[in-house]
Amino acid sequence: MSERSVSKQDQEKRWYTVLAPEEFDRAELGETLAEEPDQVYDRTIQAALSDVRDGGDNNIKLTFQIDDVGSDSASTQFVQAELTRDYQRSLVRRGSSKVAVTVTVLTTDDYRVRIQPVAYTTKQADQSQQHAIRRTMIDLVEEAGEERTFEALLNSIIEGRLSSAIYDEANTIYPLRRVEVEKATLEAHPEEVHEEEETAVDFSGE
């Protein structure tokens, strides 16, 4: 392809400023290039929490997906929050236990979220202690989802309040070194949840 044709193609493209959701004050995430607005939809972009929120944890990586496009900007929705791989590796210690669970919750405003907390013990915990810690994590995560809106739950996760609550409770079972939410993923929006419920009702009525 000639330099002339490449230059012409580039001139036909447009840069769109990608913005975070309202939960993150529509902070600028970066830019994306496209010929047509339709090409921008569903693209994903990642950012550290510290890039979109003052004082945010640099070890938390956020993923957003473009869901609306304007003349020169694109809005996004939250997809996932996850600890960076390097930070996860730094938490592992020889001679201790890693206790992890996966819990799916429905918030008060009908968002379905999959949450994966993990607890690291100071020394090796036995099976009964690990089971009790796991049960505590499940109970507290389910309680957090049942009592909060999606935005409040997300803030509780990325600000470390949910991890702290789990630590305080589970540490009475066996001494813990650290508790983190390894990953939190938005599985379904309210309209998707409602559609699934309606479909389930239709099937049950047949």
From Swiss-Prot:
User: Per its UniProt record, what Pfam families does this chain match?
Assistant: Ribosomal_S3Ae
Keyword vocabulary terms for this entry: Ribonucleoprotein, Ribosomal protein
Which InterPro entries did the record assign? Answer: Ribosomal_eS1, Ribosomal_eS1_arc
- SMART domains named among the record's database cross-references: Ribosomal_S3Ae
Give the signal peptide range.
none
Q: Which GO terms describe its molecular function?
A: structural constituent of ribosome
Does the keyword section mention Glycoprotein? no
* Source domain of life: Archaea
Q: What's any one GO cellular component for it?
A: ribosome
Keyword Plastid attributed:
no
Please provide the Gene Ontology terms (biological process) for this protein: translation
In the record, the note on similarity to other proteins reads:
Belongs to the eukaryotic ribosomal protein eS1 family.
Its recorded name reads Small ribosomal subunit protein eS1
